[in-house]
Amino acid sequence: SRAEIEFFIQGVTSGDIPDYQASAWAMAVLLQGMNERETTDLTLAMAHSGETLDLSQIAPNTVDKHSTGGVGDKTTLTVLPLVASCGLPVAKMSGRGLGFTGGTLDKLESIPGYRVDLSKQEFLDQLADFGLVLSGQSADLAPADGKLYALRDVTGTVQSLPLIAASVLSKKLAAGASGFVLDVKTGVGAFMEEREEAVKLSRLMVKICEMSNRNVVCLV
């Protein structure tokens, strides 16, 4: 139930639920799966496990994009300025490399003087001033995701579709954008190698966004 999921996430975040119990839960999700309602409740509980941003006072509609990543993925660096130049505010928090793929932050940090560690206020100020902000993820946003991801990484449960979807979207929901563009890469060199699995993930993430009252489009 929603109450049970919220209790579990609160316990994981506070440390009241030990790692071995959380790991067993993650393995149960991998083996048994979760339905769309359960996955959405998990995503929302993770999103509200820490601080959340309210961007509505800066702009009524803001967008964010997420790519599941792959070799040579640099879409963020071109898509964000193009969208912002059309007058639609873009507020994005990016991540680092996962496995063998290079993350957006890793690429940006190769530019001398570029800062990715913006404070919450700097993030909001830049969005208000320029209509575009790109920063690293704050540790205060969706802290439950950080704990669960670390456990998934060492327990062989990284590939669970409900856990992947909840991990991606909990951070996005916490960051406050009203609409998302999701880019699910597939094939050799991508995080999701099999197209069938990529399509399943994309449909699940679209459903979660719809059930969370967010506008979304997903490309595979």
Listing of model-derived features with the role each one plays in the protein:
Residues 7, 208-211, 215-220:
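A glycine- and small/hydrophobic-rich beta-loop-beta segment
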Residues 64, 90-94, 116-119, 134-137, ...:
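General beta-strand structural signal in soluble alpha/beta enzymes
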Residues 61-84, 88-100:
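Glycine/serine-rich anion-binding loops at beta->alpha junctions
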Residues 107-133, 202-209, 213:
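A glycine-rich helix N-cap at a beta->alpha junction
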Residues 112, 124-193, 197-198:
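Divalent-metal (Mg2+/Mn2+/Ca2+)-assisted nucleotide/phosphate chemistry catalytic cores
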Residues 25, 108, 182:
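Residue-level signal for inorganic ion chemistry
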Residues 1-72:
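Acidic, glycine/proline-rich low-complexity segments that act as flexible tails and inter-domain linkers
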